[in-house]
Regions:
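P-loop NTPase Walker
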Residues: 1-102, 106, 186, 210, ...
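ATP-hydrolysis module of ASCE/P-loop NTPase motor domains
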Residues: 18-19, 99-192, 216, 278-280, ...
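Conserved helicase NTPase motor core
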Residues: 6-17, 21-29, 36, 56-57, ...
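Helicase P-loop NTPase motor core
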Residues: 25, 29-37, 41, 274-277, ...
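Conserved RecA-like helicase ATPase core segment
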Residues: 2-7, 43, 229-324, 394
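Conserved helicase C-terminal RecA-like lobe
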Residues: 165, 361-373, 385-518
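Conserved beta-strand -> loop -> alpha-helix junction used to position metal-binding or nucleic-acid-contacting
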Residues: 79-92, 373-394
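Short, polar/flexible loop-turn hinges at active-site or ligand-entry regions and domain interfaces
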Residues: 49-54, 74-80, 95-108, 118-130, ...
Length: 518
């Protein structure tokens, strides 16, 4: 019988074989960290070291959780809980809160905006859209750092928080306090409160802490370089006096420091867990040698990054650096290069333009649309949250009650035709084109399913779409991706243009210390 670890390389296998005690895996980009931790969990379960029902794997996004859960299923592992920090904490709150407080759990707000706006108005602080957004971000930073309004004031001065517009530390502190009062009055909580409340209850109610620790004995945490103080505190409380935890991450890939995340917990992991065994994954299966060489050159100046990547892809095109006179010229010439790549046979979906902030997308949207190049904005509205997609799914479900002899793909085309789909893309109009792209993507998915399973019927297709929606696996339209660097993390394309590599923009200008620049 083949060993479950035979599919791993030597570095991955060494980490996966270490199934007991604290483990820290430093995994560079494209080195197979998800593959390693899923095989480690599977190996621990198969060998009887871990009970799957007492194992909790924590990720940072619902999509990552879905991918990890799916891979464990492919390895024959079931029963392991795979959740985000927030979903794991919320599940515990829903169970324990009514027991200890004899009341319902506060309502979870999908957005802070309205409550922050109310608090800003009460404090006579500017409440325009941009100011509310900046206030909400600053309140979030304070809460993930476990700071009260008074403590925020002191900490913000200490670390020299860079505030936008007319905001001051004093104004933020006052709005923060008023915001907390509004939450309390409305019996509501935000996403940070989910973690803060779980942490507080674990600290103050031993019965809850003991029950959670009895339930979960083995922990795995992905993307540990992006853990915030409140998340690390919650993990520590889940563990108690135990240390059966495996963390994986890369200090060089910390991308959420602006919202309170810090790589210090990964870098200093051994100071918290003295028996920690360290492993490095440096074999990059994602990028060719020229790209890895440039990455290593950039990261060589970062003393916190222990991993020097080694490409397993061999040679490839060199990385090119091009200067432009202005943003308009940059967009125009990148657009021309994209046309040339498409003419050479590279599909639009295999091309991406990345930038630091979302506002940079507009000029590329205009240029590529003018050239007739289909585009897909990533990091904007989620695919399954788009109005036209929701409407399409509603009509597809309605079609489940209609019997007929047509092939599934024909039925899908007929139904989507009733909501605006046509075989040919519209000639003009960005909104019309985006709607058509969404509907045509659903048609493409139907064709893919029919090709895989000629017996597939409409109920099978609707079920597959529901599964994608649940796991946030949005389908990829055949369009050039426009995305911020943050939204692009972990994704791959054949050709990538990084726009706006200019002093003050990358890294963003409000980075003032060495840590912020890193």
């Amino acid at each position: 019988m083949p060993d479950i670890l035979d599919a791993l390389d030597d570095q991955q296998r060494a980490a996966a074989e270490c199934v007991s005690g604290p483990v820290a895996i430093f995994a560079g980009a494209g080195t197979g960290k998800t593959r390693t931790i899923t095989h480690r969990i599977a190996h621990a379960v198969e060998s009887g070291v871990h009970d799957p029902s007492q194992t909790l794997a924590v990720t940072f996004t619902t999509r990552a959780a879905g991918e990890l859960r799916n891979r464990l299923g492919q390895l024959g592992v079931s029963g392991v809980q795979v959740r985000t920090f927030h979903s794991a904490a919320l599940r515990q709150l829903r169970f324990f809160y009514p027991q200890f407080f004899n009341s319902s759990l506060p309502d979870l707000m999908p957005s802070k905006f309205r409550f922050v706006a109310d608090a800003a108005t009460l404090c006579r602080v500017a409440n325009d859209k941009d100011s509310i957004r900046d206030l909400a971000a600053e309140i979030e930073w304070a809460k993930v750092n476990i700071l009260s309004p008074d403590a925020y004031r002191e900490k913000a001065v200490q670390v020299r928080r860079d505030l936008s517009g007319d905001l001051t530390i004093e104004k933020v502190s006052k709005v923060f306090e008023a915001y907390l009062t509004r939450l309390d009055e409305a019996h509501a909580m935000d996403f940070e409160d989910v973690l803060l409340l779980t942490t507080a209850m674990m600290e103050n109610y031993p019965e809850m802490a003991n029950a959670v620790r009895k339930q979960y004995r083995h922990f795995t945490v992905d993307e540990f370089q992006d853990v915030s103080p409140v998340q690390f505190e919650l993990l520590s409380l889940w563990l108690g006096d135990r240390d059966d935890v495996c963390v994986v991450g890369d200090p060089a890939q910390t991308i959420y420091s602006f919202s309170g995340a810090t790589s210090k917990y990964l870098i200093d992991f051994k100071s918290h867990f003295a028996r920690t065994q360290d492993f490095q994954l440096s074999h990059s299966y994602r990028s060719t040698e020229p790209i890895v060489a440039v990455a290593n050159q950039v990261l060589a100046k970062d003393a916190t990054s222990p991993v020097r990547l080694v490409s397993q892809r061999g040679k490839g095109p060199n990385v090119s650096l091009t200067s432009y006179a202005n943003d308009e010229e940059e967009a125009r010439l990148i657009g021309q290069q994209i046309l040339e790549l498409i003419a050479k046979g590279i599909a639009p979906r295999d091309i991406a333009v990345l930038y630091r902030i979302n506002s940079q997308s507009e000029i590329f949207e205009a240029e590529l649309s003018a050239l007739g190049v289909p585009i897909s904005l990533r990091g904007a509205e989620r695919f399954f949250e788009r109005a036209e997609v929701k409407n399409a799914l509603l009509n597809l479900r309605a079609g489940l009650h209609v019997t007929g002899t047509k092939a599934m793909t024909e039925t899908v085309r007929d139904i989507l035709s009733s909501v605006g789909w046509r075989a040919q893309a519209p000639d003009s109009g960005r909104a019309a084109r985006e709607t058509w792209e969404s509907l045509n993507t659903i048609v493409d998915l139907a064709d893919e399913l029919q090709a895989k399973d000629s017996t597939a019927q409409l109920p099978d297709f609707v079920k597959s779409l529901d599964l994608r929606s649940e796991m946030e696996f949005a389908p990829s339209a055949n369009a050039v991706t426009l995305a911020s660097i943050h939204a692009a993390k972990g994704l791959e394309w054949e050709a990538v243009f990084i726009a706006g590599v200019s002093e003050g923009l990358l890294p963003i200008s409000h980075a003032t210390t060495a840590t912020e620049f890193n």
